[in-house]
C-alpha cells in the first residue's frame, strides 16, 4: 500500500510538473496571440489619437491664424480710415484755398478795374469846371438874337461864334462820354437823391409833385458813379 501511495504521489508530482511546465508556454502563446490581435486596434487607436491631436493642433493654428488675420484687417481698416480722414481734410483745405484764391483774383480784378475807372477822378472834377464854363458862355448869348432874321455883320459873327462853341462843347462831351464821364441833365425827371441835390423847393400847380423843374448846375457821373450831383429845384405841391 505504501508503495502504491508513493507511486501515486510520484505520478501526481510528475503530472503537476508537466502541467506547470506546459502552463507558461500556453500563457506565452495566449499573450502573443492577444498581442497580435490587439496590435491593429492599438495602431488604429494610436492613429485616431494622432489624427485627433493633429486636427486639434490645426484647428488651434487656424484659429490663431484667423485671429491674426482679423487683427491685421482691423489695423488696415484703421489705417484706411485715417488716410480717408486725412484725404478729406486735405481736399477741404485745397477747396478752401482755391476758393480764397478765386475770391482774391476777383477782388484784385475789381480793385484794378475800380482804380482804372476812377484814376482820372480828380482830373475829371477839374475838367467839368471847363465844361461848365462852356455852358455859361453859351447861355450869355440871347436866344432872340440867334433867331433874328435880319442880322448885321456883327450879329452874324456872334452867331458863328455861338455855333462854334456849341459844336466844341458837343465834341468835348462826346469825348468825355467815351471815357466814362457823362453829364446829368435831370430837368423834368423825378427827384433822385442819389444823383440830385435839391437847393430849393417850390409849389407849382401845373407840375407834378417831386419833379425837377429847374437846374441850377448840371451834374456829372464817372463810370456810373456820381462825380458831382446836379443842383436842382424841386416841385413841392404837398
From Swiss-Prot:
**One Gene Ontology term from the biological process aspect of the record:** protein import into mitochondrial matrix
The family database entries (CDD domains) matched by this protein are listed as: GrpE
Quote any Pfam family the record assigns.
GrpE
One term of GO molecular function? protein homodimerization activity
Coiled-coil ranges (or none): none
Q: Does the keyword Cell membrane apply?
A: no
Gene Ontology cellular-component terms for this entry are: PAM complex, Tim23 associated import motor
Paired cysteines (S-S): none
Q: Does the keyword Ribonucleoprotein apply?
A: no
Name by which UniProt lists this protein:
GrpE protein homolog, mitochondrial
Q: Which organism is it from?
A: Neurospora crassa (strain ATCC 24698 / 74-OR23-1A / CBS 708.71 / DSM 1257 / FGSC 987)
Amino acid at each position: 500500500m505504501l508503495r502504491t501511495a508513493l507511486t501515486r504521489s510520484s505520478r501526481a508530482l510528475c503530472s503537476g510538473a508537466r502541467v506547470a511546465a506546459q502552463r507558461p508556454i500556453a500563457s506565452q502563446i495566449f499573450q502573443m496571440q492577444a498581442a497580435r490581435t490587439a496590435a491593429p486596434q492599438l495602431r488604429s487607436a494610436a492613429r485616431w489619437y494622432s489624427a485627433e491631436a493633429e486636427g486639434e493642433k490645426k484647428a488651434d493654428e487656424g484659429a490663431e491664424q484667423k485671429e491674426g488675420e482679423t487683427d491685421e484687417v482691423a489695423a488696415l481698416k484703421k489705417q484706411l480710415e485715417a488716410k480717408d480722414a486725412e484725404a478729406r481734410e486735405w481736399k477741404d483745405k485745397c477747396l478752401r484755398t482755391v476758393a480764397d484764391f478765386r475770391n482774391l483774383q476777383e477782388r484784385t480784378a475789381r480793385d484794378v478795374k475800380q482804380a482804372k475807372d476812377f484814376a482820372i477822378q480828380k482830373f475829371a472834377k477839374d475838367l467839368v469846371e471847363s465844361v461848365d464854363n462852356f455852358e455859361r458862355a453859351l447861355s450869355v448869348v440871347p436866344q432872340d438874337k440867334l433867331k433874328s432874321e435880319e442880322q448885321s455883320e456883327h450879329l452874324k459873327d456872334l452867331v458863328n461864334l455861338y455855333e462854334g462853341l456849341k459844336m466844341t462843347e458837343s465834341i468835348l462831351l462826346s469825348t468825355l462820354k467815351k471815357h466814362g464821364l457823362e453829364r446829368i441833365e435831370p430837368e423834368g425827371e423825378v427827384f433822385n437823391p442819389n444823383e440830385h441835390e435839391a437847393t430849393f423847393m417850390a409849389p407849382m400847380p401845373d407840375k407834378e409833385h417831386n419833379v425837377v423843374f429847374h437846374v441850377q448846375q448840371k451834374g456829372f457821373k464817372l463810370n456810373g458813379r456820381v462825380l458831382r450831383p446836379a443842383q436842382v429845384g424841386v416841385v413841392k405841391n404837398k
